[in-house]
């Protein structure tokens, strides 16, 4: 099998990733301009990205009596200061606006007898959100002058003189190679799962917290193109219901369940209640012989059993099925909990592209929004929508004010070269290893040497140096891999993306000489927090090597622009 068909497309805006941020950006651009848009989606926008299975709450909302600065303060505290104040505030100021827009599009938001949204805690409101992604996708599909290309896997940016010109990719169903030339590009490809050995083995390995199909393509393309990245060392580890990997927040907030050890002792007060502290406390209780750990649901009101079962059917039905299979309701037994493997995801932590206040990266004309954008944790659904909107608004303004020449007399030659690369991997050559075996080897290395589950999320510099050496060896070996069809070709590039991210992540973990976030970055060489590290750890690939850049914190009242940026 080989790629024989080629297509070159010229457009105003290319959106890579038709998930939460990507779809909302398209809606905003078309509302504010007549720009031509192409959305390149690896799956199908109807059920792609983090919202594919739906959600039962909007977790980032300014409820009555609160203001945007309150949300900024919450996110800053959870991340222990390492956030971009400008990004958090501009996001928080628009959370309610995008929520209202989603309701207008058809999202069902629960209301009380007074017609007010039903709050769940200080920052959340309840929704019936099983169909939230189809609602977004349907709105996009109705837009004029927007071409959605489903099953198109983007593999590389086209960058000249540090300015984005478009991207290359291939279609996984018909095998067409694409070169899409664009005046502006928005990367909205989500975060990175599958770097570490997961909770569940074999067939169930994709029973995980984050979509296994989000493999960090946007990060990897940016790294290889020389974009600056930030805070990868703030990994995200979710505290989940054991085995089902279902959310714990639904129980903790819905019925006020506390974290308890096997002795029935509440331990969350001992370690703290930030996201990383909850994971760390659970890990420590198990290590010190007081596990397993649970969310205490025994004794809750019977009507709450039905509420919890219904809530999980909207988002994680396996948890409801587990209760039914065991023949015990939540009120009759506590729910066992565990931490997941680490992920890189800018919607929960501050990891991702280093962007200016308008969400433009250090590559001119390339924007990032949602999980792929760094500096702004605790985005959740609405934060991703806002970032898509903010990036879109700046894109619209720049399209008005600037002139562009995206054509290149070498377009066909460049696409020919990319097709040769694809077909070299699609060749019939025998490989000693399969792509899946190489992926498992990568996950084993990261698990053992870079702070995975088996090492209790802990690492030291010697281990990280070994991880770097072994990942580099795997990168060399991956050059011998082959793919028998277009689907396997996608798997090859997903592996390539993850290996690229692993190297950058290792450098970030090495660079921060402190332990600011337990479990997220548990550095045994530097087990204490230090004010000397109240700064951003950024990286940039320069001439094939990853360079560490330390930057000072940015506050809410600053409008950050990239300085001394080579063009």
Language model feature labels by segment:
Residues 104-155, 231-380, 385, 448-567:
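Mobile, glycine/GP-rich and aromatic-enriched active-site lid/loop segments adjacent to catalytic centers
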Residues 13-39:
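N-terminal Rossmann-like FAD-binding beta1-loop-alpha1 element of flavoenzymes
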Residues 59-91:
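Glycine-rich active-site loop/strand segments that organize a redox cofactor
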Residues 129-156, 160-179, 219, 225:
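Helical element adjacent to the flavin cofactor pocket in flavoenzyme catalytic cores
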Residues 8-11, 174-184, 362:
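Core beta-strand elements of the Rossmann-like FAD/NAD(P) dinucleotide-binding domain
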Residues 400-484:
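Long, amphipathic alpha-helical stalk/connector segments used for oligomerization, subunit docking
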Residues 31-53:
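Glycine-rich FAD pyrophosphate-binding loop
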Residues 187-246, 381-394:
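Glycine-rich loop(s) and the adjacent beta-strand/alpha-helix scaffold that form part
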